[in-house]
Curated annotation (Swiss-Prot):
<dbReference type="GO" id="GO:0043123">
    <property type="term" value="P:positive regulation of canonical NF-kappaB signal transduction"/>
</dbReference>
<dbReference type="GO" id="GO:0005739">
    <property type="term" value="C:mitochondrion"/>
</dbReference>
<keyword id="KW-0496">Mitochondrion</keyword>
<dbReference type="GO" id="GO:0008385">
    <property type="term" value="C:IkappaB kinase complex"/>
</dbReference>
<dbReference type="GO" id="GO:0017024">
    <property type="term" value="F:myosin I binding"/>
</dbReference>
<dbReference type="GO" id="GO:0005138">
    <property type="term" value="F:interleukin-6 receptor binding"/>
</dbReference>
<dbReference type="GO" id="GO:0043025">
    <property type="term" value="C:neuronal cell body"/>
</dbReference>
<dbReference type="GO" id="GO:0071222">
    <property type="term" value="P:cellular response to lipopolysaccharide"/>
</dbReference>
<dbReference type="GO" id="GO:0140738">
    <property type="term" value="C:NLRP6 inflammasome complex"/>
</dbReference>
<keyword id="KW-0043">Tumor suppressor</keyword>
<dbReference type="GO" id="GO:0005654">
    <property type="term" value="C:nucleoplasm"/>
</dbReference>
<dbReference type="GO" id="GO:1900016">
    <property type="term" value="P:negative regulation of cytokine production involved in inflammatory response"/>
</dbReference>
<dbReference type="GO" id="GO:0071347">
    <property type="term" value="P:cellular response to interleukin-1"/>
</dbReference>
<dbReference type="GO" id="GO:0043087">
    <property type="term" value="P:regulation of GTPase activity"/>
</dbReference>
<feature type="domain" description="CARD">
    <location>
        <begin position="105"/>
        <end position="193"/>
    </location>
</feature>
<dbReference type="GO" id="GO:2001238">
    <property type="term" value="P:positive regulation of extrinsic apoptotic signaling pathway"/>
</dbReference>
<dbReference type="GO" id="GO:0032722">
    <property type="term" value="P:positive regulation of chemokine production"/>
</dbReference>
Length: 193
């Protein structure tokens, strides 16, 4: 479904410099679906159209990224560009997928966190940042301290994964979101594998 990515890029490249800046500002305030986090402001404001397209797709997947781009363009009064994206969405059959991608992919193949457990244990290096993002909302103080007490990144990730069986989908989504913020290229690489 690379068509959605291409359509987002085409739309963003058609914006003037001021319009792209306005798009990014609106993206910071637009209502997001439950389970999706915001692209950090500092990173967002520095992005050009290509980087922003990649970030939209990596954060929100192609179908929801396309839908979100349409919403922001409509809010800006750029109906024609939004309609072009709508046409692409309908042609690619993304209408049904946009509403159910997270649920379908979870039901069919298991959650990203479960699928890529070994790779995450081996490749996540900034574990403390991930822990900080999960502390309080997913991890109790005791769990947080138990993971931090481990000496290597791999041991910390193993300890973190020892708590995963008791987590619900929201907890796993929170871990995925933290990983996307701290290790975006690792997550992108694993999503494509």
């Amino acid at each position: 479904m690379g068509r959605a990515r291409d359509a987002i890029l085409d739309a963003l490249e058609n914006l003037s410099g001021d319009e792209l800046k306005k798009f990014k500002m609106k993206l910071l305030t637009v209502q997001l679906r439950e389970g999706y986090g915001r692209i950090p402001r500092g990173a967002l404001l520095q992005m050009d159209a290509i980087d922003l397209t990649d970030k939209l797709v990596s954060y929100y997947l192609e179908s929801y990224g396309l839908e979100l781009t349409m919403t922001v363009l409509r809010d800006m009064g750029l109906q024609e560009l939004a309609e072009q994206l709508q046409t692409t969405k309908e042609e690619s059959g993304a209408v049904a997928a946009a509403a159910s991608v997270p649920a379908q992919s979870t039901a069919r193949t298991g959650h990203f966190v479960d699928q890529h457990r070994q790779a995450l244990i081996a490749r996540v290096t900034e574990v403390d940042g991930v822990l900080d993002a999960l502390h309080g909302s997913v991890l109790t103080e005791g769990q947080y301290q138990a993971v931090r007490a481990e000496t290597t990144s791999q041991d910390k990730m193993r300890k973190l994964f020892s708590f995963v069986p008791s987590w619900n989908l929201t907890c796993k989504d929170s871990l995925l979101q933290a990983l996307k913020e701290i290790h975006p290229y690792l997550v992108m690489d694993l999503e494509q594998s």
